[in-house]
Amino acid sequence: MRILVDENIPLADEFFGELGDITRLPGRDIDAAAVREQDLLVVRSITRVDAALLEGSRVRFVGTCTIGTDHVDLDYLREAGIGFANAPGCNADSVVDYVLSSLLLLAEEDGFHLAGKTIGIVGVGNVGSRLAERLDDLDVECLLCDPPRAEAEGREDFLSLDALLERAEIVCLHTPLVTEGEHATRHLLDASRIDALAPGTVLINAGRGACVDNQALRERLQRANDLRVVLDVWENEPGIDPALYDLVDIATPHIAGHSIDGKMRGTELVYQAAMRQFGLPARKKLGQLKPDPWLRKIVLTPWAPPLEALSLCTRACYDVRRDMLAFDRYRRRMGMATGFDAYRAEYPLRREFSTLRVELKQNKGGLRDALEGFGFKVKLSSK
């Protein structure tokens, strides 16, 4: 069997090596000529998978190591009889880590506490639901909006988008990109909704770039500059709007879900689906292959100030400022589009909060709840 894999997918050799010969290519270099003689294709979101790519090829199975599938023509795959799998939820915890690191940075810069804030989560799927679960331990009020789920499940606790935007001090977008239909999400935040945001609102988009009208957001910021904005996803990636880039508070190149833990989970999920497709046993397990984190434990004394302790643990695992500064260096050296892709391709090793164990000598000031809310493993010690 011949297997073509995006070069940035971790553990591909370990999981798929037993199946046959593996070829690795950059995601944007995977074209019709490259896939023609392949049996199995494993990609990320930067590779468009459709008839133009696969027509006339030997490909029998396509896996994308991502949650989203908007880069894949699912109708074509069904019609062509080509098996398919994505990796739902694989990097959800990584995205939540990104959001919490960003919120902590803004809270420190602006001098506010997350406790007592009203946070609106738009899109309550794998990412949004996990973000809500973690925030539950932080004494914040979570407002939830997910019209498809509200309709399917009869959820009366879900708000309409406009009701959420009217009340939320912090708005987090975690929706898929849906371009048509009753629940279309393209430009979900359009010019009218962006203009209606209260001054001082924090807007975080770590879902899909086109869910926010980037031009309208740029115009609001140019006109008033009265929002705090975190963008990890953008319209027209990688050729994003440089004027908008200059105006937002935290700008990163679609890396919120790029923890090595999330990537490895994605590889495992696609491997398992491929084994089912070809009627083979899935012998490899992620637990056998995952590397140990370089930082295993932090010990905090009873005198640790809660906010400083939370900040220390968060930044020990993941400091969003690292990505902000590194992306800025890349885009200044290479240009926006090339730098965007290059940083994603060369992204440094990052572990999730759950890989770090925090040992507390005393649960002072609700620190344990805050740390567990952020996703750390916490142990109380009497020693």
UniProtKB/Swiss-Prot annotation:
Active site per the UniProt annotation: R208, E237, H254 (proton donor)
Binding site residues for NAD(+): D146, T175, D232, G257
Domain of life where this protein originates: Bacteria
Keyword NAD annotated: yes
MF annotations from Gene Ontology: 4-phosphoerythronate dehydrogenase activity; glyoxylate reductase (NADPH) activity; hydroxypyruvate reductase [NAD(P)H] activity; NAD binding; protein dimerization activity
Keywords (A to Z) from UniProt: Cytoplasm, NAD, Oxidoreductase, Pyridoxine biosynthesis
Pathway named in the protein's UniProt entry: Cofactor biosynthesis; pyridoxine 5'-phosphate biosynthesis; pyridoxine 5'-phosphate from D-erythrose 4-phosphate: step 2/5
GO biological process: pyridoxine biosynthetic process
Subcellular location: Cytoplasm
E.C. number: 1.1.1.290
Enzyme class: oxidoreductase
GO cellular component: cytosol
Binding residues annotated for substrate, in chain numbering: S45, T66
Catalysis: reaction(s): 4-phospho-D-erythronate + NAD(+) = (R)-3-hydroxy-2-oxo-4-phosphooxybutanoate + NADH + H(+)
Recorded family membership: Belongs to the D-isomer specific 2-hydroxyacid dehydrogenase family. PdxB subfamily.
Job description of the protein: Catalyzes the oxidation of erythronate-4-phosphate to 3-hydroxy-2-oxo-4-phosphonooxybutanoate.
Assembly behavior: Homodimer.
Name of the protein in question: Erythronate-4-phosphate dehydrogenase
Phylogenetic placement of the source organism: Bacteria, Pseudomonadati, Pseudomonadota, Gammaproteobacteria, Oceanospirillales
